[in-house]
Amino acid sequence: MQTEKPDPSTDPGRGRRLGLDVGTVRIGVAISDPDCILATPVETIQATADDADVQRVVEICRDNFVVEIVVGLPVALRGNHTQSTLNAEEFARLVKEELPDIPVRMVDERMSTMAATHAFHASGVNSKKGRKKIDQAAAVHILQGWLDTRRRALS
């Protein structure tokens, strides 16, 4: 899958967006307000071998009337794909199968977890104690980047 940029011709309009930071252990989840101004953390989902993690994302989307899903695509700093890239793409594919009417966008998430970790360290939160929160913060970082880029693309 290729990373995407917001495109006015395919934008679903007003409504909540869901941001996902997909990891092998945890999945950080963030959501926007309906006007797409601010991303806020929702929860951290435990990654599972069965589809319980996918089903939880589906439930969050349905409960919040999500109109678009933004999944962070972890690529190496040099731009090459890794096993984490493949895992995120597979997770996005499974979500798309469950929610075929909701666009699922892949965005470059390089440095999102690092940015979230640095922010937590700067605020005095230990990364070991705050791992679940860091995953949520990374999802917020991914989604907020999409919202900000979307706003510029639509104006």
Swiss-Prot record:
Source organism phylogeny: Bacteria, Bacillati, Actinomycetota, Actinomycetes, Mycobacteriales
Family the entry assigns: Belongs to the YqgF nuclease family.
The keyword Lipid biosynthesis appears for this protein: no
Coiled coil: none
Entry keywords, A to Z: Cytoplasm, Hydrolase, Nuclease, Ribosome biogenesis
Highest taxon listed in the record's lineage: Bacteria
Top EC class for this record: hydrolase
Enzyme Commission no: 3.1.-.-
Any one annotated GO CC term: cytosol
HAMAP family: Nuclease_YqgF
Compartments, record wording: Cytoplasm
MF terms in GO: nuclease activity
Main localization of the protein described in the UniProt heading: cytoplasm
Pfam family membership, one: RuvX
Keyword S-adenosyl-L-methionine: no
Species per Swiss-Prot/TrEMBL record: Corynebacterium jeikeium (strain K411)
Annotated NCBIfam families: RNAse_H_YqgF
GO terms of biological process kind: rRNA 5'-end processing
Descriptive protein name: Putative pre-16S rRNA nuclease
Record's function text: Could be a nuclease involved in processing of the 5'-end of pre-16S rRNA.
